[in-house]
């Protein structure tokens, strides 16, 4: 029977954070570092929990080199060869604790993952990524990976509801990726009509995960540092970024020059371009669920990282959180009809 859930569900654009009294004198006093103990792997994480998405135009080795300097994390895309992994690991051993090896559910993906983790034991994180994390096949795959790698920390997704977060955690995942359709180059909501507003998804999934001592990643939907802060305020343990990290020197994607301006290609991993590149084209039984865009070239990603980190520090001072850990406890969202005045920009 069709059913309508009449509860209001909200996105990042629908809210602002209410400022609160603070004893902080400076943004520099804010500690953005988090430490987590993972439920199933029993491993520890320490760092600033922002993750470059496992897209071949974002989650590159070049990106990982820069992000690890800031104690940020990279989910490296799955299309690097074993030899490329070995070369990177030998030249950048300090980065290995701040990255994950990614895999789909295919047998060739799993074989590649096994080879990487066996060859480079310092890599302790695995990112199991499918568009639809609700399939029984995916749940069984997570169980198999947990059985094969009992001491690796497993990220798995994507889902948007509490019951599936619980299912994946109980199946062996440590960190659940939350988000269906919010990404800037994702067209799943248009092609399928399926999705969930990201802010509400994060709040509900965080509640489910934390009850089991699990963790979540807010994956997608952030277009500015304020959105990243809102995701943390809503209870996300990690925030994964794609579009915000696209278009840089360290990003993948072809560099294009037109009329004296530089652009970089950025595309979803379910887009026609990605499927042509890695699968020989779009299979007859499926539709492309991503698009390709040209992002104005932004230069070195270091400047963007500083902007994001600076924004979150400022958020913490506005709400009186001396540590990022306190941000969700200090968060009160207010519903709004307008975020910014769009007089001098295209923002709305």
From Swiss-Prot:
Stored Gene3D superfamilies: Aldolase class I
Binding-site list for NADP(+): 26-27, 78, 129-131, 180-181, 269, 285-286, 314-317
Residues annotated as catalytic: 186 (thioimidate intermediate), 188 (proton donor/acceptor)
Keyword Flavoprotein tagged: no
Residues binding K(+): 181, 183, 186, 189
Residues involved in GMP binding: 219-221, 242-243, 268-270, 286-290
UniProt KW NAD keyword: no
Keywords carried by this UniProt record: Acetylation, Metal-binding, NADP, Oxidoreductase, Potassium, Purine metabolism
InterPro entries: Aldolase_TIM, GMP_reductase, GMPR, IMP_DH/GMP_Rdtase_CS, IMP_DH_GMPRt
Reactions catalysed: IMP + NH4(+) + NADP(+) = GMP + NADPH + 2 H(+)
Broad EC category: oxidoreductase
CDD domains, A to Z: IMPDH (cd00381)
GO biological process, one term: purine nucleobase metabolic process
PROSITE patterns: IMP_DH_GMP_RED
Enzyme Commission number(s) of this protein: 1.7.1.7
Chain positions found as N6-acetyllysine: 291
CC per GO annotation: GMP reductase complex
Record-level Gene Ontology MF annotations: GMP reductase activity; metal ion binding
Biological role stated in the UniProt entry: Catalyzes the irreversible NADPH-dependent deamination of GMP to IMP. It functions in the conversion of nucleobase, nucleoside and nucleotide derivatives of G to A nucleotides, and in maintaining the intracellular balance of A and G nucleotides. Plays a role in modulating cellular differentiation.
Subunit structure: Homotetramer.
Family, as annotated: Belongs to the IMPDH/GMPR family. GuaC type 1 subfamily.
Protein name: GMP reductase 2
Higher taxonomy: Eukaryota, Metazoa, Chordata, Craniata, Vertebrata
Gene encoding the protein: GMPR2
